[in-house]
A protein has these predicted regions:
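Short hydrophobic/aromatic patch on the recognition helix
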Residues: 59, 202-203, 207
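All-alpha amphipathic helical-bundle segments outside canonical DNA-binding/catalytic cores
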Residues: 133-150, 169
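A hydrophobic/aromatic-rich effector-binding and dimerization subdomain
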Residues: 1-21, 66-135, 152-157
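Short, conserved beta-strand element in jelly-roll/cupin
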Residues: 30-47
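Terminal helix-turn-helix DNA-binding modules in bacterial transcription factors
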Residues: 177, 181, 186, 190, ...
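Short acidic-glycine-tyrosine-enriched beta hairpin
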Residues: 51-65
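The alpha-helix within a helix-turn-helix
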Residues: 193
Length: 238
């Protein structure tokens, strides 16, 4: 396998990449309008989803839904290898009209239950599906779809065994959840600081550490994705 390849069409955006000396500054916090399945294949780092830190081990899988902010805090000391696939919900509509395969992405709070490890799966079949998607094929789209669907089914089965545990949320997590619940409201630093009894400097510090974005950048990114989703669904965002 080469150190880099991409496949893109109307429904799928898939890539494999290896950086011998990763540059942490190149990996910025971002969101997507699509669903993402990310596989960490090698390196050293922490993946952060909506402020939740996930220390990584080779073979870890993470899932993110549209507008779920994420980035990797990568160490430059080791080569960084990863595989990711982004896909639209339309890809699954005719196959899975009840949304079973998207349940792990949707039926949870932001920044929770993003990480899947070997112990979460009943068998090692999921590894085969990942390997197959990264192999050369005369019809890459067919190869991707015929392996993505059973992989999503394995993740869905693993998700059903997970139990919701009440966790005392950190301040940054509470603020992130508050912003997402009120993303259409008149949000400002003053409003957030008044609600959580903190100074603007403290808010900006903990928020940037958790998300790699400023509060304003985060709100803008979320609103842009929400507006695009409304437009795609035929609804005016105003």
């Amino acid at each position: 396998m080469s150190d880099f390849f991409l496949y893109r069409d109307n429904d799928i955006d898939m890539g494999y990449r290896r950086d011998e000396t990763p540059v942490p500054e190149h990996f910025k916090a971002h969101t997507h309008e699509t669903y993402e399945l990310y596989c960490f294949l090698g390196g050293k780092g922490i993946y952060r989803v909506e402020g939740t830190p996930y220390p990584l081990k080779a073979g870890d899988i993470l899932i993110m839904r549209p507008a779920e902010s994420h980035y990797i805090d990568i160490s430059p000391d080791r080569p960084y290898t990863r595989f990711s696939i982004n896909f639209k919900a339309e890809l699954l509509k005719g196959i899975d009209p009840k949304g079973h395969l998207l349940s792990p992405f949707i039926n949870r709070k932001l920044g929770t239950f993003n990480l899947y490890r070997a112990e979460n799966f009943k068998t090692d079949a999921y590894k085969l599906f990942i390997d197959n998607m990264t192999e050369n094929s005369p019809d890459r789209r067919v190869q991707i779809i015929t392996n993505l669907l059973p992989l999503l089914n394995e993740i869905s089965a693993a998700f059903e065994t997970m139990s919701e545990i009440q966790i005392d949320q950190t301040l940054d997590s509470r603020i992130i959840n508050y912003i997402n619940r009120h993303i259409s409201d008149n949000l400002s630093l003053d409003v957030i600081c008044e609600r959580y009894y903190i100074s603007k400097s403290h808010l900006c510090h903990i928020f940037k550490k958790a998300t790699a974005m400023t509060v304003c950048e985060y709100i803008t990114a979320k609103r842009l994705v929400a507006a695009k989703q409304l437009i795609l669904s035929g609804i005016s965002p105003t």
